């Protein structure tokens, strides 16, 4: 099973005072300087949506957002175009992109140190219900590959994989 359109979300450690609007000029500066090897296009404000996407940096290859989906603030990387290579290659690409964005936000002086993303928990999902439906059979088919990827990445540190059972949700 080929994983494409991988999403990675890293959650905020704690920033109850963070006003998501403060992220808008930062995302605009990322567009102006084209800091990534991706085409970044626009910024959208969805703060009015409860438990929603928050502030979204729209790109051609991927979107970045500081979102509040599931009522948990975090940074979400949403890959939209295909990535070549193996499933571990694609997982690595998505995780690397999400971590780089987190590090850049954490280091941005305009946020005055208000933002810190945890590294001990993350959510990985596949935004393609046709390629990877959220069924137990999908999980069983790719679980060994995902376990191997994270075991290698974490150098033997214990970790727990879990899957959302609701077939209406994305696989993850």
State what each model feature region is.
Residues 4-8, 116-136:
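Short glycine-rich, basic-tinged beta-strand/loop micro-motifs
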Residues 35-38, 102-113, 154-157, 161:
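Long, hydrophobic, amphipathic alpha-helical segments used as structural scaffolds
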Residues 22-30, 83-109:
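Ampiphathic alpha-helical segments that act as solvent-exposed interaction surfaces
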Residues 11-65:
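N-terminal low-complexity, intrinsically disordered segments
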Residues 162-172:
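C-terminal edge-of-domain segments
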Residues 61-89:
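Intrinsically disordered, low-complexity regulatory segments enriched in Ser/Thr/Pro
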Residues 133-155:
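Short, low-complexity, polybasic intrinsically disordered segments
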Residues 14-25, 85-89, 133-138:
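Short, conserved charged micro-motifs
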């Amino acid at each position: 099973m080929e994983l494409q359109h991988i999403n990675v979300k890293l959650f905020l450690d704690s920033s109850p005072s963070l006003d998501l609007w403060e992220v808008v000029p930062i995302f605009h500066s990322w567009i102006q300087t084209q800091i990534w090897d991706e085409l970044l296009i626009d910024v959208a404000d969805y703060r009015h949506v409860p438990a929603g996407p928050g502030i979204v940096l729209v790109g051609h290859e991927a979107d970045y957002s500081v979102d509040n989906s599931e009522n948990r603030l975090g940074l979400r990387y949403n890959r939209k175009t295909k990535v070549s290579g193996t499933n571990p290659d694609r997982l690595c690409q998505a995780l690397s992109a999400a971590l780089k964005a987190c590090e850049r936000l954490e280091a941005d002086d305009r946020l005055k140190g208000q933002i810190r993303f945890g590294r001990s928990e993350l959510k990985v999902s596949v935004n393609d219900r046709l390629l990877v439906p959220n069924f137990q059979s999908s999980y069983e088919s790719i679980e060994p590959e995902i376990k191997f990827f994270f075991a290698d990445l974490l150098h033997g540190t214990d970790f727990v994989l879990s899957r959302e059972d609701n077939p209406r949700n994305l696989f993850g």
